[in-house]
Design a protein with these regions (language model features):
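Interdomain hinge/lid region at the active-site interface
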Residues: 45-114
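Generic structural signal for well-ordered, non-transmembrane alpha-helical segments
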Residues: 8, 23, 27, 86, ...
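Internal alpha-helical scaffold of NAD(P)-dependent oxidoreductase catalytic cores
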Residues: 1-61
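Intrinsic disorder/low-complexity signal
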Residues: 37, 57, 90, 138-139
Length: 140
């Protein structure tokens, strides 16, 4: 607190789960997407650079993180990370199945629900321009 940090108290298991969903899994997803782009022989590096939009650029920014640190994070918090990755894999499989079946309603409902979540985060005061995203204490 003396350094301006917001201190939150939670038990270790809950902390690990929160960080797995908000930090660890997004890093693994970013590493994976950048790796897939690199491994996809039919897409050249020039095309990846020329056609990448903000989302992919964010993946490359995240994937540029320190590999030693992230290896250690994943191995230290493997239980929570594996739980979140399992849930992510299930959701991804459901979306894959909806695309395969041409189920536009399922896709729309999923995208609409997740868009509403993002909007509620913004409505709750997240400021994407602020260095700390406008976060105060969770209790505020």
């Amino acid at each position: 607190e003396a350094l301006g940090a917001n201190v939150e108290f939670m038990d270790a298991e809950h902390h690990d789960l929160v960080l797995a969903v908000t930090s660890h899994a997004p890093h693994l997803i970013a590493y994976t997407m950048v790796g897939v782009a690199d491994d996809l022989g039919r897409v050249t590096d020039k095309e990846v650079i020329n056609f990448s939009a903000a989302g992919f650029r964010d993946f490359t920014r995240i994937a540029a993180s320190d590999p030693t640190m992230w290896r250690d994070v994943f191995l230290h918090n493997k239980e929570a990370t594996l739980e979140i990755l399992g849930r992510f894999t299930e959701e991804l499989f459901d979306l894959q199945r909806a695309i395969r079946r041409g189920d536009g309603d399922q896709l729309f409902e999923y995208f609409d629900r997740t868009r509403a979540i993002r909007r509620s985060i913004i409505d709750a005061g997240q400021d994407t321009e602020a260095a700390n995203f406008g976060r105060g204490s969770v209790d505020e």
